[in-house]
Amino acid sequence: MKKTLQIALAATFFAGCASTSVTSSASKDNNELVQNQLFKIEKIIVNGKTFDPKNAEESPNISFENNKFYGYSGCNRFFGSYQTKADTLQIEGDRVASTQMLCHPMDVMDFENSLLSNFKGTFKISNENGKLVLSNDEMKIFFK
């Protein structure tokens, strides 16, 4: 009886561990990747053209938290609202709100203008080589 009880307890323990592992990896979907984290923007591709923020004084970044996003685009701060469903992120409204400073060099402004004017609509959330990527028909954003 004692041996049977030990075997039953061991089987329950291992079955519980196995189901916990499967459940936690299955429940971790791509939209959880964006929640409550600060991401540095590595580069963006807009309509086939690559924009790199290498000359920005501070790395462009974005943070997603409680259906609000906040970021720095190389010169100005920006913010807005979003919703996630399955593997998509929907930017609410037809444009992102931002401060309006003029900055140099011009490639920083080009990066910023391309990012902010195209950061709208629905983006697919994906994980490429361990890095977060947001993409739609017009733009692809690569994060560090």
What residues fall within each predicted segment?
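Lipid interaction determinants
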Residues: Q6, C17-K144
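Sec-dependent signal peptide recognition
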Residues: K2-A8
